[in-house]
Every structure is written in structure tokens, then in C-alpha cells.
Amino acid sequence: MSEANDYSYNIASVEKTIRLIELLAETNGELSVLQIAKRLDTHASSAVRFLITLQNLGYVDKCEQIGKYRLTDRLLKIASNLIVSHPLTVRYLDVMHTLAYNLNATTHIMAFYGLSTITLHKDLQTQNISYNNAFFDPKRQHYCSAPGKLLLSTLPEEQLSEYLSGLKFIKYTSTTITSEKELRENLELIRHVGYSVHNEEWLSGCLTVSFPLRVYGEIRGAMSIMCSIERKDEILSPETLSEIKRMLAEPDV
């Protein structure tokens, strides 16, 4: 991810428009003009002008029955275009489907953004509903997730310490990591071996292995492979791991 520009001047109207879009996305459009104005720390008349502009551009709809606003599917169209042209899609989508077929496993491509993992693609080869739902459970924490731990392993110490300072460990299963010391040791292992493992730490019966996805040498996301824990020895065999790493290796530039 590119660094923010050092240029310190922001256009206030653009900044407020982006904040408005983010606000509507967070609340699913359940806000009135007065609520929006309060959240944006602006006058109601200003909030109305921003909303009308976004309506005219096709980004916002108003429910006349309740007088509240929501985002339209136009943003979904933009997101869809972004996913199609995303470098992780261009470079790794075919590999994801190939791995799912070859290993008879569920596979996911996730992008990393800050402390977030964003699912771009999935191939539910195993057709396991629990495996699918596990990736989208809002209660799930990075410390008990293979892609989450992989993300944590890439953070500089300052960001990792900030994450840990607000973390409350919960023991979901008998193998869940429950201390900072144990987590840091696991992250160091991930950096050493080049992949992360979910060993029933969140979902019993599930093995997940996540590998870093690089774009121009920078880790931008993860390829995750999910299957039954009974296949642990097979998936974590040196031969299988080596082949997966070979398939995910970034070509020489």
C-alpha cells in the first residue's frame, strides 16, 4: 500500500464527502439529515447539499417514507471493477481455482488493508458452510485466524504493539492462542517458515493454511486453503507446501 502524500493541505469538501460515504456505509443508510450533520460536525443545510449532490450523481437514495438516506449499488459497481482489476486478482485468481481443484479444498484470496483482511475471491470446492461462514464472522479475531496471523506477522512493532494493547484473548477451542507471548512466538514462526496455520483455533475440525501474496515484492494479501483437520499431515507435508509456494511465487520482474 502506498504511503500518504506529505502534502498537508486537504480540500475540506472532498474530505467531508468521503466521510459521508463512509458513514452511510457503516450505518447501512439508517441516518437522517440531522444525524448525519451531527456525526460530520456540520450544519444540517451543509449535510443536505452534500446529500443532494451525491443523489444527483447516483450514489445516494432517500427513503421518502422514513426520510433517511442510504448508498446505492453504484458503489458496488465501483468495488466490482476494483476487484476485477486488483493486482491480486490479475496475478492469483487462476492459481486459487487450480489449488482448490488440485487439493479438493476451499480457497480464498484476501487483501490486507491496515488491520483489515478483505475477502476478494473464494472457491468453495468442499462446499462446507461452516468453512465459508468462519471467514465472515465479525467476532473472529486475527490471533485465531490463519490469514489474520499472517497479517499480524507483517506489521512493524509499533502497529503490532498497538493491536496487542487493546486485545482481549478468548479461548474458543483447546488450541486457541491465549497470551501475547504465545502469539509473538507464533508470529516469529510464521515469518521463518513463510506461511500461517489455523489448527482448530477458532473452528473445530478445520485446518487453514495461509500463504503471503506479493505484488512487486510487497505482501498485499493471503491465499488461504481450508480443509478437514484429518488432512493435516497431507496439506502440511513438505512436498505439498513446496508446490504451493512454487505456484504462488511472484515472477521475476
Name these PLM-found stretches:
Residues 39, 93-102, 193, 250:
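Amphipathic alpha-helical regulatory segments at dimerization interfaces
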Residues 25, 152, 156, 245-253:
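Short amphipathic alpha-helical signal-transduction/dimerization elements
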Residues 70-166:
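Amphipathic alpha-helical effector-binding/dimerization core
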Residues 10-14, 33, 68, 72, ...:
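Short, structured helix-loop boundary elements
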Residues 60-62, 109-110, 213:
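A structural signal for short hydrophobic beta-strand segments in well-ordered beta-sheet cores
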Residues 175-249:
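Extended hydrophobic
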Residues 2-83:
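N-terminal helix-turn-helix
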